[in-house]
Amino acid sequence: MLDNGRYKNALNRAYYSIFHAIRAVNALAGYDSSKHSGVIAFFNQNYVKLGVFPKELSKIIKLASESREKADYLDFFIASKSEAEKQIARAKEFQSYIKIYLQDNNIL
């Protein structure tokens, strides 16, 4: 998407990679929600606030969510390549924490 100039789509996909990683972790605790806010709140309360994951991940989630909402819902929002690249980098960082967690818990 970056190569094709589809920066809004890149922001969307970066967010959803984070969101579904959160859902995977939450599922291990038997939790899911039909609302994004519920999924994120459960993760923050049960994993970030308890120190399982660093607080930095909450910031990554918030930035990704805000970017995705702008990209998806604001008619005149123009996403930049730089913004998309930064969001993809944050999503990769987030994924690395999730991967380590899953490996440490013998899921991967």
Model-identified regions with their sequence ranges:
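Terminal alpha-helical segments
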Residues: 1-108
